[in-house]
């Protein structure tokens, strides 16, 4: 069971086959947090001498930047470190859970060795428009190659660089229709988007409706 708690946390039912169940607060969002809750239950029924209080405290103190990190609730701005097909499937599931009626302006860049068609296939139902960009990193794939793959996947796109400009374009579009601004595909791109967001927030009211 998933329950949204604040901007970036959930409560999960932790259950185990040996008739143990409880509710654990995890300061992270995402369908994959069920696995963490299951690990909690497994710890409780193990032979390890670990108190319930210690386990709860340990999970509550977990911090992981860019793990479905909601920087603003409305219109949503989300930073995620998803960078392969499997993590994109998890990301789409999380979007479907918390924002079932919204699509995203996806600020996207990727490294040369990634399965980009697989990432597009996983996320396509949630993409309002792909905003292709490139991180300032030697492994970052050129925008033109990503655009070619987006065209083949029939994903609506535009190319905007540098990353700061890509964020500005996504925010501009989101302000018009309330769609999500989402950064994913490359940890390098997401790191630059987060830095740009922090700078913009200092000189504007971007965070006025942050949860």
Language model: regions and residue ranges:
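Active-site catalytic pocket residues across diverse enzymes, especially alpha/beta-hydrolases
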Residues: 47, 95, 174, 197-201
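Active-site-proximal loop/hinge segments that shape catalytic or ion-binding/gating pockets
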Residues: 186
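Nucleotide phosphate-binding/pyrophosphate-handling subdomain across enzymes
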Residues: 12, 18-129
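Short, flexible loop segments at boundaries between secondary-structure elements
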Residues: 135-137, 202-211
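Acidic, glycine-rich flexible loop segments
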Residues: 183
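RNase H-like, metal-dependent nuclease domains and their acidic two-metal-ion catalytic environment used
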Residues: 190
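C-terminal helical cap/extension that packs against the catalytic core
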Residues: 8-13, 76-77, 85, 118-180
């Amino acid at each position: 069971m998933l329950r949204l708690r604040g901007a970036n946390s959930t409560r999960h039912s932790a259950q185990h086959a040996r008739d143990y169940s409880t509710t654990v607060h995890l300061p992270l969002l995402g369908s994959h947090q069920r696995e963490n809750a299951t690990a909690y239950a497994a710890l409780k029924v193990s032979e390890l001498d670990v108190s319930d209080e210690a386990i709860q405290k340990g999970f509550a103190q977990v911090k992981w930047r860019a793990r479905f990190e909601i920087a603003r609730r409305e219109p949503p701005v989300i930073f995620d470190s998803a960078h392969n097909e499997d993590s994109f499937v998890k990301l789409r599931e999380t979007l479907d859970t918390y924002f079932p009626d919204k699509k995203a302006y996806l600020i996207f860049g990727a490294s040369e060795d990634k399965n980009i068609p697989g990432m597009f296939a996983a996320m396509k139902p949630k993409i309002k428009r792909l905003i292709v960009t490139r991180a300032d990193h030697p492994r970052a794939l050129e925008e033109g190659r990503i655009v070619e793959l987006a065209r083949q996947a029939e994903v609506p796109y535009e190319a905007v660089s540098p990353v700061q400009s890509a964020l500005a374009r996504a925010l501009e579009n989101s302000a018009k229709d309330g769609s999500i601004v989402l950064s994913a595909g490359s940890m390098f791109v997401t790191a630059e988007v987060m830095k740009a967001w922090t700078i913009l927030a200092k000189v504007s009211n971007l965070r006025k409706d942050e949860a």
